[in-house]
Amino acid sequence: MDIYYKKDNCTLALGDTFEVIEKIKSESIDMIFADPPYFLSNDGFSNSGGKVVSVNKGDWDKISSFEEKHNFNREWIRKAKRVLKPNGTIWISGTLHNIYSVGMALEQEGFKILNNITWQKTNPAPNLSCRYFTHSTETILWARKADKYARHYYNYDLMKEINNGKQMKDVWTGPLTKISEKWAGKHPTQKPEYLLERIILASTEKGGYVLDPFVGSGTTGVVAKRLGRKFVGIDFKEEYLDIAKRRLEVVINNEKETK
């Protein structure tokens, strides 16, 4: 494992997630957020800024068979389970291309799925083929270890408070990532900060440890740090870790200026 960046309880590790997770202490993580490969890179096309573009994100997003995809998901979820605290939870984001494998893998590896969150995007990319409905949602599975004595943390009162005094439902509506959040560089699947803010507030307390095994541009870390959580992020692409590092530096420097 190569520590790419470490500062103020924020760590970015460069390497293969399967190998790096092995270095993390057992039952030390309060919450995991993962946005694993969607396996969309099949030489198809999408829309970006009104232009037709390839959906190929790189070799990391390609796979040859369902078995390979499912084995991949089972392996990283199995390793993630070891580092999760007994009362910890895991959130996994995906689309129809991978989420069914993820859900099955969670149950096969000893997790209980708590919620099936639907993130409804208010400004999705248009459907260029006109052969099916526009893809405007992503699914986020929330799960805990399937131990009947486990009592996962959920900040019910806060979720109700930020939802105008009503119980928070499992359909969350909002826009794609703002341009202002992409200033540090490009990443094909960068999540909006408001999404991670809700997830982290719902399932962790201040001072808790958050892990993102596919950290990408670092949104999970940026929000975790801003909310007073400790953070570990892993990625095998140095160019993405550089984006995450630059974003984390801004949050850390802003905190120092306000003290």
Language model segments and positions:
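Core catalytic lobe of class I
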Residues: 1-242
